[in-house]
């Protein structure tokens, strides 16, 4: 899904999308560049 893609690619746009998806927030944190790391 989009959050798996965000984690794999560390795409800022996808990280922003996942940031608004509570179930994905913790998965994205630490896997994406700042400010999502």
From Swiss-Prot:
Q: What domain of life is recorded for the organism?
A: Eukaryota
Keyword annotations for this protein?
A: Disulfide bond, Pheromone, Secreted
What GO molecular function annotation could you give as one example from this UniProt entry?
pheromone activity
Q: List the disulfide bonds.
A: 3-18, 10-32, 15-24
Say if the entry is tagged with keyword Disulfide bond. Answer: yes
Q: Which residues cross the membrane?
A: none
Pfam families tied to this protein: E_raikovi_mat
GO cellular component, alphabetical, reads: extracellular region
Task: Just give the chief location class.
Answer: secreted
The stretch of residues making up the signal peptide is none
Where does it reside? Answer: Secreted
Keyword Transmembrane helix included in the entry's annotation: no
Which InterPro entries does the protein's record reference? Pheromone_protoz (IPR009064), Pheromone_protoz_sf (IPR036245)
Q: What is its biological role?
A: Mating ciliate pheromones (or gamones) are diffusible extracellular communication signals that distinguish different intraspecific classes of cells commonly referred to as 'mating types'. They prepare the latter for conjugation by changing their cell surface properties.
Q: What is this protein called?
A: Mating pheromone Er-22
UniProt organism field: Euplotes raikovi
**Species lineage:** Eukaryota, Sar, Alveolata, Ciliophora, Intramacronucleata
